[in-house]
Amino acid sequence: MANVSNCEIPENLLYFIEGKNTVWAKQEAPDVIVVGITDIAQTMAGKVVKVRLKKKGTKVERGKPVATMESGKWAGPVPAPASGEIIDVNPDVEKNPVLVNQDPYGKGWLVKMKVNNPEELKQLVTGSAAVSKLTELINSEKLQCKRL
């Protein structure tokens, strides 16, 4: 795992990076991904106080929200890294939103999706390319990641 300015960047994950929006996807099967926000995103948001997840069965286009989040300094959507259908949600983050801050790559996962076209996942960045892109964002925002 890469660590840049205290921000953890697991190189085995796939990343959807659009401006300051950084979402990770973990492939569980060729057409199934688990989705969450990065350490960078949770640091930029600050303490997350509310998470609203789209319902199971919701069809989502790439870049459209799978969830919305609110913190003291930010409210906004969490974009889908690929088009597909939400097949599972993490009820724990709705009850205890700070999990997103405490464990963004583990207990703070948001939704599980069945991807329409697994080829679409090839558009996401991973490995050293992801570390490089996310390092640029960390540096441009002068970030020091921290967990709550």
Curated annotation (Swiss-Prot):
It comes from Sulfurisphaera tokodaii (strain DSM 16993 / JCM 10545 / NBRC 100140 / 7). Binds 1 lipoyl cofactor covalently. The glycine cleavage system catalyzes the degradation of glycine. The H protein shuttles the methylamine group of glycine from the P protein to the T protein. The gene is gcvH2. The keyword Nucleotidyltransferase does not apply. Its cofactor is (R)-lipoate. The glycine cleavage system is composed of four proteins: P, T, L and H. Residues 32-114 form the Lipoyl-binding domain. Keywords: Lipoyl. Transmembrane segments: none annotated. It comes from the Archaea. Pfam families: GCV_H. The modification N6-lipoyllysine is found at residue 73. CDD domains: GCS_H. HAMAP family: GcvH (MF_00272). Belongs to the GcvH family. Gene3D superfamilies: 2.40.50.100. One of its GO terms (biological process) is glycine decarboxylation via glycine cleavage system. This is Probable glycine cleavage system H protein 2. One of its GO terms (cellular component) is cytoplasm.
